[in-house]
């Protein structure tokens, strides 16, 4: 999805430098795999080996009320169908887990239709073309886009999937993170909406997550003073010690509101909003005149059984003449080459450190997605299928 950019082919030496930066950025002690007992939930066992001509996929069984549970999805296996003219078959190697996945299984209006009962769970992914009857895709080509929770995806000529040039020495998972839609999301929010100026104060909620960690580092590269909000002392230390944030607020601490006030003595000029709820109210109350709010997500309400209440401090946007703008990354694919070129350059220069959490095993998908809402991941959460 726009990952096939100038940054995707940075050249041998540059690729090695980018790869080295990303490798040291992976948080090994917070990388959850199927073999790691610290993984945030019970592992799924007993599926066994499967035929190469079969396709395992997770279908939506029922819409959850609140948290995703064991009855939300069902594992289904089918024969890989024969391709028709104009189709290609992709082997899915990596699957992206994102808060928006939770929104897509609600039966409510959104920017994409909800996943239907009995349909393959929608998700971004990265894979390789293994068969093709269309000139759009060639065998051996890497592709990125909406591949879904399945091991093989049949792609039509109109599929929301694009080729991506994976540079030698760089993990393909990077193209689902900082060098993919995650990076583009952060870049649009900072460059087009937040527009931080040197010396301004930028607050990023869910700052240790996939988008927030990149957004904060982009703002820091612009010369802003960056305050990150994260859950727990370990994540807060990560923000200040590894990512270069100027201050961090632990939203799990009893005194988080006092921490926010202390970290923003001159008010807040830019809010990169990923969470909503009480955190957003506290941020809105500290906005400066002319502040900009980039509304990227509202993860605090995605598992809510009932609609969450609206912001209580909304009136301060009026008083401070602030601007609030929501945005969806799907509207900005055309900006991907520009964004990826800049982000790759910042990684190479040591000014941006990508983070990722890797879960190994296709069967872990229904459990792994809850890591997003339990605060068990750092940076981009991806599942390695094979």
Predicted regions span which residues?
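Glycine-rich phosphate-binding loop and adjacent beta-alpha segment
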Residues: 278-352, 385-386
